[in-house]
């Protein structure tokens, strides 16, 4: 009997009978983000530059090491949007590249403040930037350089796939994990969305910039990146950058101050071709014969000492961290 009564009411609740009823759409519930000061603790300065200051920090909940970059609004020249909010383009680029790939720094969070933005990123421990790493060694042997260089190429390829060009590839923007030898590309403050047309602005490091920028203040993203990769590879195997002055960049003459294999020299010279159209593509660099030479390194000659998980961490507690 009860079931039959429910059945008799079905016409009242049917969709057709409800067409004339007003429908009230509730606005989505906005979840407020916890204040930065409650989520993170900030410590000492890791570094500073034209785009802001980077601090060491940690996440309060679990002690996760983080790097916090404070970017002043007045210094931001390139902007983008996330969820309809205007943010520095650097945050947009980090969001694009920072997931699913270990070779670039990962964005964890960001906050807007009245005077600027706080960009929260992962902070790898037991790392050293490649500049300091090379300085300590004097220069890298070709096997170590090859392994590092391939990782940089993979990071660049990943960025391209995400529609991003870094525009400031250099030794100071690469972190070396001292336990594994893994490299991580950092600092997208000079980056841009990748495009096939010319760029007429450049905020990267001048000694890594291509001759077409020095002479014409114009360049294409991919060919300019290849030039900076040539400078970086020279830096790895020779211990210093090839050019210091604008005139040297425009002349493009190379002097190899150390004994370098002909294959490595040829790849560097190719990347540092004065005409952008003469430079290799990223895939041509991957396919170059020097990139495929034997990578067997004797343990006594290895620059990176691999550590197993059960290694006594206390023996390596001091680290030179850089972001």
From Swiss-Prot:
Family affiliation: Belongs to the protein kinase superfamily. CAMK Ser/Thr protein kinase family. PIM subfamily.
Enzyme class name: transferase
GO biological process per UniProt: negative regulation of apoptotic process; regulation of mitotic cell cycle
Catalytic residues (UniProt): 168
Protein name: Serine/threonine-protein kinase pim-3
Keyword Kinase in annotation: yes
Location relative to the cell: Cytoplasm
Organism whose genome encodes this protein: Coturnix japonica
E.C. designation(s): 2.7.11.1
InterPro entries: Kinase-like_dom_sf, PIM1/2/3, PIM_Ser/Thr_kinase, Prot_kinase_dom, Protein_kinase_ATP_BS, Ser/Thr_kinase_AS
Function statement: Proto-oncogene with serine/threonine kinase activity that can prevent apoptosis and promote cell survival and protein translation.
Binding site for ATP: 46-54, 69
